[in-house]
Amino acid sequence: MPRQLGELAAHVGGELLGDPSQLIHGLNGLEEAGPGDVSFYGNPRYRRQFEATRASAVLVGADVPPREGVALVRVANPHLAYAKLLRLFHAPERPAAGVRPGAWVHPEATVHPEAVLLPGASVDRGGRVGARTVLYPGAYVGEQAEVGEDCVLYPNVTVRERCIVGARVILHASSVVGADGFGFAFNPEGEAGPEHFKIPQVGIVRIEDDVEVGACTCIDRATVGETVVGRGAKLDNLVQIAHNVRVGPLSLICAQAGVSGSAEVGTGVVLAGQVGVVGHIRVGDLAKVGAQSGVAHDVPDGQVVSGSPAVPHREWLRASAAAGQMADLLKEVRALRRRVETLEKEKGP
């Protein structure tokens, strides 16, 4: 549905430089946008695209001067404002409440009347599903597990027994909450010979409010106690969270990262793609870990680290620069060695 530009500017709390009655039909990138579209410009590297855009309006920072032929909406954070308008134009459609034919609810489970269970969804004995939560086909809520209100469990999500999921949580397809932790004790005298004796994993996973978990991500239950993902944390696809890990509020963990058992990830931490964190250490609040880093020791609050093993980022940059010069340095060393050998021969015994 088209909306007036003035309404959109008010929605994001922006200052409009342009016609408030102009109709906007959608949003698009600077290069793809055309008449009737809104785009955003928040990074100087896209200046060329901004100057050439055919968008009717652009969300910009407070210091961007007026532009002829394009309405501007000045805001503190153009990217955030763009996200808010995307949500306004593309609000998710929630299926009508109710348990569809083909869904299964155990007689001792509790499903709120406003919840949605699509065909193939299951809620086991003692499971609880909150108001306005949607379970897509194949989603499973195990025995005594709890899923709060306004959650979305996409196809084939598993929330295993006794695990707790808070409110407004999104679990993307095939994610698993509460699989057994990877815990074994070596027994040299097993019945059939030496064995890895399975340690019972009797704890749970607790996911707090406003968490989003990407597709095919696994969060293992604690051996005892809880594995915790804090409020507002966001986990990308293909992330592994091991038993008894604690992920702090508002942390971001990118694809293919793994956090080993009993490690603690603080508040507002960023783990970039393919980061590995060893067990029983702490990554401090607001720390950032560069892609493919291996974190083997505690990281202080606020520190940026990179590399494997991870070291302070500037130190890693210097080491990387030196590594790039290694071939030339080796040539120089060999040349110096030959020169020394020649001088020693000329000098004689």
UniProtKB/Swiss-Prot annotation:
It catalyses: a UDP-3-O-[(3R)-3-hydroxyacyl]-alpha-D-glucosamine + a (3R)-hydroxyacyl-[ACP] = a UDP-2-N,3-O-bis[(3R)-3-hydroxyacyl]-alpha-D-glucosamine + holo-[ACP] + H(+). It comes from the Bacteria. GO terms for cellular component: membrane. Keywords: Acyltransferase, Lipid A biosynthesis, Lipid biosynthesis, Lipid metabolism, Repeat, Transferase. Signal peptide: none annotated. Its EC number is 2.3.1.191. The active site is at H243 (proton acceptor). InterPro entries: Hexapep, Hexapep_transf_CS, LpxD, Trimer_LpxA-like_sf, UDP_GlcNAc_AcTrfase_non-rep. Transmembrane segments: none annotated. The keyword Acyltransferase applies. GO terms for biological process: lipid A biosynthetic process. Pathway: Bacterial outer membrane biogenesis; LPS lipid A biosynthesis. One of its GO terms (molecular function) is N-acyltransferase activity. Gene3D superfamilies: Hexapeptide repeat proteins (2.160.10.10), MurE/MurF, N-terminal domain (3.40.1390.10). NCBIfam families: lipid_A_lpxD (TIGR01853), PRK00892.1 (NF002060). Homotrimer. Catalyzes the N-acylation of UDP-3-O-acylglucosamine using 3-hydroxyacyl-ACP as the acyl donor. Is involved in the biosynthesis of lipid A, a phosphorylated glycolipid that anchors the lipopolysaccharide to the outer membrane of the cell. Belongs to the transferase hexapeptide repeat family. LpxD subfamily. PANTHER family: UDP-3-O-ACYLGLUCOSAMINE N-ACYLTRANSFERASE, UDP-3-O-ACYLGLUCOSAMINE N-ACYLTRANSFERASE 1, MITOCHONDRIAL-RELATED. This is UDP-3-O-acylglucosamine N-acyltransferase.
